């Protein structure tokens, strides 16, 4: 049934994402977009996890793909190791409700309820965006409370260069 077909594919796809470096690419894009902002690395974790969630649908694959880059960045900026881990775990968990792929449960819902998967994905879009907005705001307020700055512009990748060189 659904479990043996789709769960196997999630595991296989997660391994593929790791080998191809897509997790690093998402972190680099997120860094270019938000690394400069107050508390930059934590906001990078939120964006990169949302991006990875669009293709993996697995919180574990998401942590592996982006957490190995974002957690050390957050600790280097001054976040506690506990907060850095919590941000990555929270942001990565959102990948399970981030369309279009989402978690295996979305496929099960579509099958059990008898609606097309695309309807389940459309219904999840607004809650997923609200979830990530909540994580972003939590990160923002903690960064302001702690006086944490972003990453200097000269240390950030240029998003246009990233898209031209690695966005294929």
Write out the residue ranges for each language-model feature.
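Helix-coil boundary and interhelical linker segments in multi-pass alpha-helical membrane proteins
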Residues: 110-126
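Hydrophobic alpha-helical transmembrane segments
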Residues: 4, 42-44, 121
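Long, contiguous bundles of hydrophobic transmembrane helices that form the permeation core
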Residues: 122-168
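Residue-level recognition of pore/gate-forming positions within transmembrane alpha-helices
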Residues: 50, 92, 111, 127-128, ...
